[in-house]
Amino acid sequence: MAPEVLPKPRMRGLLARRLRNHMAVAFVLSLGVAALYKFRVADRRKKAYADFYRNYDVMKDFEEMRKAGIFQSVK
């Protein structure tokens, strides 16, 4: 029984092949993370700001601050 000879690894272009594969995976992962961030964080934050400013009354807030004595120039 003769020992089996392992085939030689293909070394030519090894770095280019690995970089191509890893770049494709990195690109897909970055798109996934960007989409996840947009839908989980950015859209919720945008909606929260819109809800806040929809009901925000500037004059009411100003009067509360004036009554609390925050402004020195407005009595």
Swiss-Prot record:
InterPro entries to which the protein is assigned, alphabetical: Cytochrome_c_oxidase_VIc (IPR051389), Cytochrome_c_oxidase_VIc/VIIs (IPR034884), Cytochrome_c_oxidase_VIc_sf (IPR037169)
Organism encoding this protein: Pongo pygmaeus
Name of the featured protein: Cytochrome c oxidase subunit 6C
Function recorded in the entry: Component of the cytochrome c oxidase, the last enzyme in the mitochondrial electron transport chain which drives oxidative phosphorylation. The respiratory chain contains 3 multisubunit complexes succinate dehydrogenase (complex II, CII), ubiquinol-cytochrome c oxidoreductase (cytochrome b-c1 complex, complex III, CIII) and cytochrome c oxidase (complex IV, CIV), that cooperate to transfer electrons derived from NADH and succinate to molecular oxygen, creating an electrochemical gradient over the inner membrane that drives transmembrane transport and the ATP synthase.
UniProt KW keywords: Membrane, Mitochondrion, Mitochondrion inner membrane, Transmembrane, Transmembrane helix
Phylogenetic lineage: Eukaryota, Metazoa, Chordata, Craniata, Vertebrata
PANTHER family with a match to the protein in the record: CYTOCHROME C OXIDASE SUBUNIT 6C
GO cellular component terms given for this protein: mitochondrial inner membrane
Pathway(s) of this molecule: Energy metabolism; oxidative phosphorylation
Family membership: Belongs to the cytochrome c oxidase subunit 6c family.
Gene that encodes it: COX6C
Subunit description: Component of the cytochrome c oxidase (complex IV, CIV), a multisubunit enzyme composed of 14 subunits. The complex is composed of a catalytic core of 3 subunits MT-CO1, MT-CO2 and MT-CO3, encoded in the mitochondrial DNA, and 11 supernumerary subunits COX4I, COX5A, COX5B, COX6A, COX6B, COX6C, COX7A, COX7B, COX7C, COX8 and NDUFA4, which are encoded in the nuclear genome.
